[in-house]
């Protein structure tokens, strides 16, 4: 192609080019949004921190599957409040009331209940926290009484508790709630159940259900009001946030793994990681391979011999065993993987570019440049490189999916960078936890499809560039 405009027109003529361009734009936009909106230390601070995901359901499918189900599964919900709805003066003390509303509309029960308390501030005596639930049938259940206890009260400044990590109460396993529900059943329904039997039945069925004659519980749909009452001696005492976790059986857009991690966030973070690995590896490998190939073909002599023998040796070394070996020795850090891929990724391009340069070396425009006294460096840069540049660009794009697939293979083998979530790591953890045998399709299909998507994107671009690089293909079309 003689001009850039002709090359662009030729590239844009094929449908593969258009689809590949659309895919790469989509991949780039998602990667930029992720980098701008998610912390760069997401892997170490959140993804590898099980405490951060403790309130999520474990191994839950995505919530959108309810669209295809007649009997809807309970969606996971966290309902919170940061400000009291009411402050009441009790004469010498105060009562601050927080109200949470939960709309229960399912034929099944929540899988667990958790109450969460954040950033509790008090000045004098520790407050008392009480939590009640008012059901749609106006029956009241006391689910938690928590007298705040702390050692070494601060007399000069306010005491601050649960600032960095919230205080959690797993109500589903609370013995005091078992006793409270035992009393509730006797008082409201004249049913005598021991706390042990309440534990076996499950607190969720009793709180959100109506007892039946056969001993089962029928879900009671409607709005549930959760009242959080803080009794304190100082009006300035406060709670930064209260939250009630209603454990569901479906979660978010992509579900969760066995640690409760939101797979959607992990998959999103994998976009810029895949793009970084692919582009960094392919760009560096292409630069090294192109420079050595041009120098080898034009300079010739011992320089050509040394470069080609080194390229032959490196090109015949099996890459995957070396990747496994070096990542096992030096650790599976991202830049170690990129470095190894670059070191062993340049020879094939060097060999091909050299053969192209050998034919260009005897061309008229090169001989004319030599005749007017142009230096070897200028000839290689100004006359030879532009002739092989389209091919080099096509190879750069074609090498990118190889790097992405290599990193995914290492991660799948458990040798990836543990501090960064990648699609291969998600697949590896899924297989190690039996996701295939347990039917956790949402844990396997999305990362696998995204790996294929990223690889196909660059393959389509490379196929679109073939008519630009190879005039014979252009004429056939």
Task: Give each language-model segment a name.
Residues 256-477:
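Alpha-helical transmembrane segments of integral membrane proteins
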Residues 1-278, 285, 430-448, 452-456, ...:
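Gly/Trp-centered helix-boundary motif
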């Amino acid at each position: 192609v003689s001009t850039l405009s002709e090359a662009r027109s030729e590239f844009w003529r094929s449908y593969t080019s258009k689809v590949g361009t659309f895919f790469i734009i989509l991949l780039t936009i998602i990667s930029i949004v992720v980098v701008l909106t998610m912390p760069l230390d997401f892997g170490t601070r959140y993804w590898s921190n099980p405490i951060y995901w403790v309130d999520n359901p474990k191994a839950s499918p995505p919530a959108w599957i309810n669209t295809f189900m007649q009997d809807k599964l309970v969606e996971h919900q966290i309902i919170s409040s940061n400000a009291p709805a009411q402050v009441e003066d009790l004469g010498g003390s105060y009562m601050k009331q927080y109200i949470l509303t939960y709309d229960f509309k399912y034929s099944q029960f929540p899988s667990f209940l958790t109450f969460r308390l954040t950033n509790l501030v008090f000045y004098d005596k520790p407050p008392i926290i009480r939590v009640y639930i008012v059901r749609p049938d106006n029956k009241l259940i006391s689910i938690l009484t928590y007298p705040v206890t702390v050692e070494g009260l601060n007399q000069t400044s306010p005491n601050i508790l649960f600032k960095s990590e919230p205080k959690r109460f797993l109500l589903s396993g609370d013995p005091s709630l078992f006793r409270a529900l035992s009393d509730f059943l006797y008082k409201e329904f004249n049913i005598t159940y021991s706390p042990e039997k309440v534990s076996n039945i499950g607190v969720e069925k009793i709180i959100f259900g109506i007892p039946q004659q056969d001993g089962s519980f029928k879900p009671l749909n409607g709005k549930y009001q959760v009242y959080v009452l803080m009794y304190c001696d100082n009006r300035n005492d406060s709670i930064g946030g209260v939250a009630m976790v209603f454990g569901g059986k479906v979660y978010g857009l992509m579900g969760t793994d066995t640690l409760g991690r939101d797979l959607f966030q992990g998959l999103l973070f994998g976009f810029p990681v895949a793009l970084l690995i692919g582009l960094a590896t392919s760009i560096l490998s292409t630069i090294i391979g192109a420079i050595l190939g041009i120098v080898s073909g034009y300079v010739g002599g011992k320089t050509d011999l040394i470069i080609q023998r080194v390229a032959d040796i490196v090109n015949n070394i099996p890459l995957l065993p070396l990747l496994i070996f070096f990542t096992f020795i030096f650790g599976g850090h991202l830049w170690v993987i990129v470095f190894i891929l670059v070191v062993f990724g340049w020879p094939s391009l060097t060999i091909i570019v050299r053969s192209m340069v050998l034919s260009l070396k005897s061309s008229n425009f090169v001989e004319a440049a030599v005749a007017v006294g142009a230096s070897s460096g200028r000839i290689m840069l100004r006359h030879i490189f532009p002739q092989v540049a389209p091919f080099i660009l096509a190879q750069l794009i074609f090498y990118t999916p190889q790097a992405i697939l290599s990193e995914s293979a290492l991660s799948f083998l458990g040798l990836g960078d543990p501090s960064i979530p990648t699609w291969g790591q998600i697949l590896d953890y899924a297989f190690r936890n039996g996701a295939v045998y347990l039917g956790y399709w949402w844990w396997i299909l999305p990362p696998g499809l995204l790996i294929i998507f990223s690889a196909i994107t660059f393959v389509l671009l490379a196929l679109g560039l073939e008519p630009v690089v190879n005039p014979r293909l252009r004429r056939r079309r």
